[in-house]
Amino acid sequence: MPHAPPLGALLRHYAAGSALACDPVDQGLLNRGYRLRTTRGRYFLKHHFDPETAAPEAIARQHRATQRLAALGVPVAPPFPAHDGRTVAVVGGHTYALHPWIEGRHRHGAQLTAEQCGRLGALLGVVHASLERVMPLQGRERGRQRGRQWVRQWTEKGAREGGGARTGESAPHTEPRTPLPARHAETAEPVSPGANPADAGADPATTFALIDDLLARVRRHRPADSFDELARHRLLERRALLEQHVGRRPPHSGPVGWVHGDFHPFNLLYRGDAPAAIVDWDRLGVKPRAEEAVRAAAIFFVRPAGTLDLPKTRAYARAYRRTAGATPSELAAAVHRVWWERLNDFWMLRWHYERGDTRADPQFPAASALVVWWTREYDAVCDAFAG
């Protein structure tokens, strides 16, 4: 098994029994995961190795966040503590965490009804409101009472419908979790000194230079294939769009707060029709909250041809605004910033041509078409999020 974790040494940290089987799950773009079966149950073993997110202190912060969210009833899968009480295990210079195994499946927006899209938006709003409650920034009180109200309503609804359940059969033999003391829920988390969540939008001059570089890489690629042809078409098209809209660079962003950072279909597990767990909190950080809502919708509701399902987007956005306490103007500003971000972003092509990493290639046709359609239907997209 490639990159096999040191199970013997790892499991000595936990009251999780002895390993019976360990199989890699579909690898994400950043970290590795394993389905682990032991004499005491089933677990998800996560190997954190992405340099940007694998620092033990950053992982511990993620773990504190999910533990506090779980205490509020938000559907998450907090890690199990080791014998020493820590949730991060460092073995052989590698960093691991042990989580409950959550049975469920991923669902794209096309598989959701309008009502379920509303519940999806409400869930993300609850996450943002709950993070504001359990990891407040210094001096931020906005939304605290609103967050409590909507978390209570969400968890009561989830209890009635069976949503948000976590498997308990595989829990190590530790004391049952109790609600976190109030002082934990009110302690402000430090922000990374390098964090700059209020950056202005991308500089088009930098983007034009990047487009030229990528076009040169496409021309040099041999043998040329259909991906090269599409890449060249989209790069030329994007350059023309950017020249047309170069004066629309957005100013600094609006309200910020703690966000999941990577909310998309492969980081949300459903059991039946209800969300069972939001996973992969590696990108937890302080950023504009409404922008995360827009980015998530652009992934959940994009169609293969590169258009957004606007009726579903509208149901999602209205529910998000209600539970997060976000205003229509916040969403409209976020739509503009994310549109500009997409107009200037070429991460999939950079992975392909600069790193030789093709894992994101299947996403490129729809994602690259979306910004073209979004530019043409800009007013309709804004109305779906803010109307």
Language model region names:
Residues 290-325, 339-358:
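Active-site activation/catalytic loop segments of kinase-like enzymes and analogous catalytic loops
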Residues 189, 201, 213, 217-220, ...:
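ATP/Mg2+ or Mg2+-diphosphate-binding catalytic cores
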Residues 29-37, 44-45, 79, 245-291:
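Active-site acidic catalytic loop and adjacent metal/ATP-binding pocket
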Residues 1-23, 141-142, 167, 180-181, ...:
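Regulatory N- and C-terminal appendages and interdomain linkers associated
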Residues 39-142, 150, 170-171:
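ATP-binding pocket architecture of kinase catalytic cores
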Residues 214-256, 260-264:
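Loop-centered beta-sheet repeat module
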Residues 110, 114-160, 166-231, 256:
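A cross-family kinase active-site recognition segment
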